[in-house]
């Protein structure tokens, strides 16, 4: 029989791996964005996005831009493809994090 604790930790590992994939895809998107649309790159603070002095409001703008699918009108197909991928990874990572939280509550109640 599979241990519930081992299953929980496996789920946590999968969630962390997907977070790393999301982070990597976001960095790659910003590199593409710098080349194809410098104005949008500045609008979302692409240069300071991953720094300690990054502006959270501009970071949330990029998340909103991608989640609302406003990138579909963009002229660069590479940018559109990367945004689609990032949006899918964001939804997957959010769902996995929610599942980890529900599993944690379940484990606390179980034991």
Curated annotation (Swiss-Prot):
One of its GO terms (cellular component) is plasma membrane. The keyword Cell membrane applies. Pfam families: UspB (PF10625). It is a multi-pass membrane protein. This is Universal stress protein B. The keyword Cell inner membrane applies. HAMAP family: UspB. It comes from the Bacteria. The chain crosses the membrane at residues 1-21, 90-110. Belongs to the universal stress protein B family. It comes from Yersinia enterocolitica serotype O:8 / biotype 1B (strain NCTC 13174 / 8081). Its main location: membrane. It is found in: Cell inner membrane. Keywords: Cell inner membrane, Cell membrane, Membrane, Transmembrane, Transmembrane helix. NCBIfam families: PRK04960.1.
